[in-house]
Amino acid sequence: MPSSVPWCLLLLAGLCCLVPSSLAEDLQGCAVQETHATAHDEEHLQEPAEHKIAPNLADFAFSLYRHVAHQSNTTNIFFSPVSIATAFALLSLGAKGDTHTQILEGLSFNLTELAEAQIHDGFQHLLNALNHSDNQLQLTTGNGLFIDESAKLLDKFLEDVKKLYHSEAFSINFRDTEEAKKQINDYVEKGTQGKIVDLVKDLDKDTVLALVNYIFFKGTWEKPFEPEYTTEQDFHVDEKTTVRVPMMHRLSSFDVQYSDTLSSWVLLLDYAGNATAFFILPDQGKLQHLEDTLTKGILARFLGNRHSSFVNVHLPKLSISGTYDLTSILPELGITKVFSRQADLSGITEEVPLTVSKALHKAVLTIDEKGTEAAGTTMWEIMPISLPPDLKFNRPFVLIIYDRNTKSPLFVGKVVDPTQK
């Protein structure tokens, strides 16, 4: 066996990562050490654990988005910051030294402001809250640890990942790469109810551990679009390229506002449940300005200042995906050692030096007309006398799905070309 054995970290993620678990009993035993805490301190201590990490997740989401966007302005972007952060927070349980510090700081955590135990508490409560938020969103997720039958992982690492991230562990023979691929792909296909097949295309026979994270998500709009009003329309990819796309249409009362700061129109559409979609349409020539300016504070202001107006909304139906090699993206955020031969993952196993040789993230998004059915009620909408304005998402726009309950960005994307798969 070579002196440095690669650890293949495989990630498949959609809109969010949901792992049923709770640290409520553990946190009930925590005592407040300061007897003269300020009102702000007391409020922070009473704050839900998942809310404590939400600002960091938002910072990570926008930082990662900008790095991905700067790599190419001609392709769609779609990824789940919550899923990526969860996977690497899990990985940090087995990291030590600079490797450990780089991972958490790369995820936008400041260890002088938030203790590591609070970070893991936050993730556990976040995943638990997402998984139990409601029954109106179809969510399927899982974390699978596939361990080579020749490897001996440390008991503490296995206990921590099972307790905190509810990971399943499987023994596998990576030397038989075809059978190993089949076992992993069967696990993902079963977990996603057949929606995701052949996730793993190739494996290194020297792999000793593969972490597979998958997600399947399907949400419905609170106010659906009517399919009979969907028509083929132009979408302007750039000044020289126009494609024909099925464009949904609805004349209704929408949460929409114009942002001078972003030079963009912002449309908020609620899913049935706790999720809200932000569709952000920049003025002509202002896409990069939007990408450079958007922050978690601006999003919070939109949510806190919602108001409705009658608008003709035109939104493309689409099905897009994003696949990313995180070994080339995360180093730009300062996470470098875990992908090198200097990686210290001795908290996973002390038998051989490990490095992450592969870290894949895949996310899939489908937007269509479907929404929840009204149950035995009829709603009349009073139309304005003046002609309502048109809001046409017929050029590149930014998309964010946000969970209102946990205050977390479930996914971030950019639609450059709705016909691009």
UniProtKB/Swiss-Prot annotation:
Marked site (Reactive bond) residue numbers: 385-386
Signal peptide stretch: 1-24
SUPFAM superfamilies noted in UniProt: Serpins (SSF56574)
Tissue specificity as recorded in UniProt: Plasma.
Entry comment on modification after translation: N-glycosylated with carbohydrates having biantennary side chains.
Localization: Secreted
Sites where a glycan is attached: 73, 110, 274
A biological process from GO: acute-phase response
InterPro entries, per database record: Serpin_CS, Serpin_dom, Serpin_fam, Serpin_sf, Serpin_sf_1, Serpin_sf_2
A Pfam match: Serpin
Domain of life: Eukaryota
Stretches the record annotates as RCL: 376-395
Gene Ontology CC terms: extracellular space
MF terms in GO: serine-type endopeptidase inhibitor activity
Annotated keywords: Acute phase, Glycoprotein, Protease inhibitor, Secreted, Serine protease inhibitor, Signal
Keyword Nucleus listed: no
Comment text on domains: The reactive center loop (RCL) extends out from the body of the protein and directs binding to the target protease. The protease cleaves the serpin at the reactive site within the RCL, establishing a covalent linkage between the serpin reactive site and the active site of the protease. The resulting inactive serpin-protease complex is highly stable.
Family: Belongs to the serpin family.
Record's protein name: Alpha-1-antiproteinase 2
Protein source organism: Equus caballus (Horse)
